[in-house]
Amino acid sequence: MSRVSFEVSGGYHSDAEAGNSGPMSGGQLPPIYKKPGNSRFTAENSQRTRTAPYVDLTVDVQDDTVSVHSLKMEGGSSVEESPELTLLKRNRLEKKTTVVKRLASVSHELKRLTSVSGGIGGRKPPRPAKLDRTKSAASQALKGLKFISKTDGGAGWSAVEKRFNQITATTGGLLLRTKFGECIGMTSKDFALELFDALARRRNITGEVIDGDQLKEFWEQINDQSFDSRLKTFFDMVDKDADGRLTEDEVREIISLSASANNLSTIQKRADEYAALIMEELDPDNIGYIMLESLETLLLQAATQSVITSTGERKNLSHMMSQRLKPTFNRNPLKRWYRGLRFFLLDNWQRCWVIVLWFIVMAILFTYKYIQYRRSPVYPVMGDCVCMAKGAAETVKLNMALILLPVCRNTITWLRNKTRLGRVVPFDDNLNFHKVIAVGIIVGVTMHAGAHLACDFPRLLHATPEAYRPLRQFFGDEQPKSYWHFVNSVEGITGLVMVLLMAIAFTLATPWFRRGKLNYLPGPLKKLASFNAFWYTHHLFVIVYILLVAHGYYLYLTRDWHNKTTWMYLVVPVVLYACERLIRAFRSSIKAVTIRKVAVYPGNVLAIHLSRPQNFKYKSGQYMFVNCAAVSPFEWHPFSITSAPQDDYLSVHIRVLGDWTRALKGVFSEVCKPPPAGVSGLLRADMLHGANNPDFPKVLIDGPYGAPAQDYKKYEVVLLVGLGIGATPMISIVKDIVNNIKAKEQAQLNRMENGTSEPQRSKKESFRTRRAYFYWVTREQGSFDWFKNIMNEVAERDANRVIEMHNYCTSVYEEGDARSALIHMLQSLNHAKNGVDIVSGTRVMSHFAKPNWRNVYKRIAMDHPNTKVGVFYCGAPALTKELRHLALDFTHKTSTRFSFHKENF
């Protein structure tokens, strides 16, 4: 027996109270969400002011009959039985009055609700399913949702209307069903027919033609971008006979197709399991089918649950911050320029002073040489050209010395770890400075060679004998007659060979070649677009430095050895760099490692677990170099360490991107086998025979080396962002944070047990982090297998929820899109029941599509005012600009200070 209250007049409202009031009543029903305007039974806001009287109706629902048990007005007074009510008791439900119309709607909804909950009383055996849908129906519907999402509203209707007028010019304004796809601009004729039938069924149109008004109505539904409308269209196309029922096979098909549309292969493989989960939820009595409306209810509930609710105070704060973050435009160009310059200097002062100092030193050297040669005896003949050439040469000598310093990684790591220079020197930009100096070398070499070949040498060749006489001490008694005189000399040969070798090395070091982006190169030349080509051609600089010393010694215009300063510039940097390379070779041979475990994961990722050498101390966020002689005895490649400093092993996760990593995966795949059931990875191999296992290739390591992410401990709040394989340094940091917090808690417990007081917090305390936000964005679902065990471990150990983890799978359509609605609903059901996310396979709930980074920064700024937040990013360069800009924007406009750091290898 069910009781329903509604208003007698006005638009009806329902405060449905479905309770167990008797042995014949149905079970407790779940709340149902419907958007206003839905033709089905609608539960509206019960808080709305009501002026019309209430009617308290108690009805008995059994099978297909509805009988009224009692009917009372508000206050308890009975209502006289009317002819309409008598008809209602007889189950005729003739719609003669407004009240009866409402009662009929209520009874219809109650029948629907009881069918959802499994029926009442003596349940009628289920009717044979009348499902004549083909397996292509759901598939076509999913494709249709893509089309529906791409329509362009009013602008599209004008084109549709124009085609309608052209097509129906000979049919009297009636559009044939077969011409529907052509009229709305749909290329798939079969899908257009399916869509036409679905839209026609919704409106009880049985003919094969429609007029212009009906077409516009069809178009409005197609163009309606609301979640409910697109979902309704999807279901209408699946439910061909409009009986509103789905069997388990059909649920399985929809899950499989939804997973396929979102590139979720794991869910596709487990479609049977998830279909059974939905049937268990919506068909607890094993009738054999579920109502389409019940599935829609779950989908809508899942969609509404994805919306984060906020308190009024938080909403106001969010609104105020949004207003403050709106860009402001100053009409005064000088003020705009000053404001931009001030912000730039505040955020980049470390880089600025280094670059300015570099320019000043080069300017001083250039000016010094220019003045020196302007006073020399060669100036009257060779003019300012020789001054320009010698000034540029001096800057080249300086830069050829400086360019080695940023790649002395051991020295830089020692300086940033053991000294306070990191406060003023941007060690994180070492590779960027290396590239800037390379540009300076290119400019200097161009000026030097150009001034000689195009200016002062021609002037020397065409000088008169009288003018040449003072230059005999430099070029000999016989005046040069051609360029060959200069080319055939030591200076000429060494100079041309250096330029050629540097041109090769610089070209292959550009991102297009180094990262293999030039796919259009012919077969033999494709090997030039690789990291290997960059690595080996960079060693040509060994020859370049030897030639540079020779070129600087055999000078035309300088005879005294102490004035030949090239070797003076180079001696310290070259010796320092040579020592670095010797240390790498020596250290890697001493610190022997054995391979404990190897796994090959989806997405071409190779995970290697190594034994940890004694005295190998590192910080989370640092990286090390790896060498495998079976691939190449000379190549060393940097990879972030994914294990935590407290672990007794070292681990790296290597993404197969180039020729070296591809060969490395091939070598290890030969000793790997498919894992047992329940173990992640496509291939695995564990060390079972100790250090003498001959199956694994020998691996050498060198490191650790400093990286920007290692400074995360300096911040109380950190935002960690990893894009794809860029999550590797962040994984180590996340583990380290948990370990440090656990250690602090254990130390506090020990002090409490011993009765000692808590030590005063030091300003130099190494670990300050109290809150961490980790965002991992990846394109493929299989990527979550890389760190599945680590994510589960962190989620389990982080009892105080210090770390907030967010996984984003960009292959899935964003939350709120009908194409991902079923996936989101499955995610909610499975996580509630099993505590596992169906997308990532971890305890961490995944999100769909890309994060809204502005909202991420905004939420952190609201939660942590007057706090300095460290933002650490590792991944593709495309996102760097956005994250850095947001960090600057929120720093300048809120009380939260965001300090952005990017990993560089």
From Swiss-Prot:
Residue span of region EF-hand-like 2: 203-214
Similarity annotation: Belongs to the RBOH (TC 5.B.1.3) family.
Self-association and partners: Monomer and homodimer.
Swiss-Prot/TrEMBL induction comment: By potassium starvation.
EF-hand domain sequence ranges: 226-261, 270-305
Extracellular topology ranges: 373-436, 514-536, 584-713
Tissue-level expression: In roots, expressed in the epidermis in the proximal regions of the meristem, in the elongation zone, in the differentiation zone and in elongating root hairs.
Ranges of biased composition (kind: Polar residues): 39-49
This protein's name: Respiratory burst oxidase homolog protein C
Keywords recorded for this protein, A-Z: Calcium, FAD, Flavoprotein, Membrane, Metal-binding, NADP, Oxidoreductase, Peroxidase, Phosphoprotein, Repeat, Transmembrane, Transmembrane helix
